[in-house]
Amino acid sequence: FIRLFTPLGVEEEGLQLYVGYLKKVIAMRSRMEFEQLVEMMDQQNVNFVRCLTNLFKDIVLAIEENSEILSGLCGEDGIVYAICELQEECDSRGSVILNKYMEYRQLAKLSSEINAHNTNLLAVGGGPEGPDPREVELYLEEILSLMQLGEDYTEFMISKIKALTSVDPELLPRATKAFRSGSFSKVAQDLTGFYVILEGFFMVENVRKAIKIDEHVPDCLTTSMVDDVFYVLQSCLRRAISTSNISSVVAVLSGASSLLGNEYHEALQHKTREPNLGAKLFFGGVGVQKTGTEIATALNNMDVSSEYVLKLKHEIEEQCAE
């Protein structure tokens, strides 16, 4: 029936009706899936990523499969109009999904606990232990998946608009703004804020643990903390860069730099500042060989750490360029 609007000369009305129909279909499908998700909220792992993926998939397919009809009514302007209108469903339904995820994982409460834990560390006598870093890592991977989904969807839709060649120039800024300043984008920014807090906590706790349990490794020139610390930093920085969010990368990179320049640097220096080290070596005895090995290992720690810093810097630059 939609093809009848062109002979009648009411293409714009036909476009509005057809896009309105597409919006209703997408809203209905998303609402049904969301209701199923809510019913499973008492379970340990609810798949919010799949729920958001299906919403994006429905929107993209609605545009892809109906491009001919949309352009037949109002040219490529019809496609842009449909994209902007369907983005309202992304803003509406997508925001609900992200908000429900943040509620499900109690990210606001978790972030408050982390901030309180950080404050307690500065107090005399410390305070209660913070959240379990292993649990935090699970949430970080979930948040990363949700953030990547949102960014990939946004980039795809904006690139699709820019690829159109005969669009009213005034529509392009409006379309781009619909993606970058809509309610979904704003909720995604809230999620990004929680990500930065959780990632910072995870990185600090694991680096401190690696330093605390540092031990000599048989047949190895360095102690265990060197590989452990740089593995943690590498993992956290890779995850931050994968978010494609500049503020996240800067925050995590700043945290990594602070850890290297302060706590890790202090740990490297600790062994070389051992009291009466020279006397132990000079007077000899049973402990000489052990002490000499410890000094050599401490120096190797510094040397290898310098290499790892340069390697990490190179990896960061490469991944950012990609």
Feature-to-residue mapping (PLM):
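Extended alpha-helical rod/solenoid/coiled-coil scaffold segments used as assembly/tethering elements
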Residues: 46, 141, 145-158, 162-177, ...
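Extended, noncatalytic alpha-helical scaffold/tether regions
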Residues: 1-191, 195-217
